[in-house]
Amino acid sequence: MNFKLLSLLLAGLATAGPIEQRQTSSSGNELRDGPCQPVTFIFARASTEQGLLGGSTGPAVCNDLKSARNQEVACQGVGPKYQATLAANSLPAGTSDEAIEEAKGLFEQAASKCPDTQIVAGGYSQGTAVMHGAIPKLSDAIKDQIKGVVLFGDTRNQQDNEQIPDFPKDKTKIYCAVGDQVCHGSLIVAAPHFSYVADAGDASRFLVEKLD
């Protein structure tokens, strides 16, 4: 698929909508800038979404986790090296090496700065590729510290056999809407790819149930 066609197909991420905007008090930089919390949520947003957490599923899950855990959750988005550009979707890993390494570094920072925190994570669209790339690179000890991962509109779903490589399948929940071809190895973006904020509540409950 040439880049011009890819850009046209993915332009829906920038123009379709409106995506429901969820208000959050989180800066999306709470691991880096704040104190350790009992739970740390690391999230990679979709292409073209603004802010470290994006404007849809990321803030929604962050809010739900904070509500469920008495606000004792640090929400951290992947960025600024992860720029969530459209072009990065066409790379072999579905995102940039810089994004994957940045996410890996955030997991490592959570484990080293806050050794007692329980880590949960998520990604939406290109952000799922960030998680698919970063988590397998982590040490076994950090993988054990990750309690659960939720992926919305998983761009690596087919390529990685409906799982994150080298990570327990029972710790992962993948949301693929009916008609979302992105989950089947395509870069064609259609309306179902923008429906995942409706799954945020279920995803948050999945993560909460994985916590001690």
Swiss-Prot record:
Molecular functions per Gene Ontology: cutinase activity
Annotated site (Transition state stabilizer): 47, 126
Active site: 125, 180, 193
Catalytic activity line of the entry: cutin + H2O = cutin monomers
Gene3D superfamilies referenced in this protein's UniProt entry, alphabetically: alpha/beta hydrolase
InterPro entries hit by this protein: AB_hydrolase_fold, Cutinase/axe, CUTINASE_1, CUTINASE_2, Cutinase_monf
GO cellular component, one term: extracellular region
Record keywords, A-Z: Disulfide bond, Hydrolase, Secreted, Serine esterase, Signal
Principal location listed in the UniProt entry: secreted
Pfam families from the UniProt entry: Cutinase (PF01083)
Disulfide bridge partners, by residue number: 36-114, 62-75, 176-183
Biological process, per Gene Ontology: antibiotic biosynthetic process; carbohydrate catabolic process; monocarboxylic acid biosynthetic process
Listed transmembrane segments: none
Claim: Protein biosynthesis is one of the keywords in the record: no
Record function comment: Catalyzes the hydrolysis of complex carboxylic polyesters found in the cell wall of plants. Degrades cutin, a macromolecule that forms the structure of the plant cuticle.
Record-given protein name: Probable cutinase 2
Originating organism: Penicillium rubens (strain ATCC 28089 / DSM 1075 / NRRL 1951 / Wisconsin 54-1255)
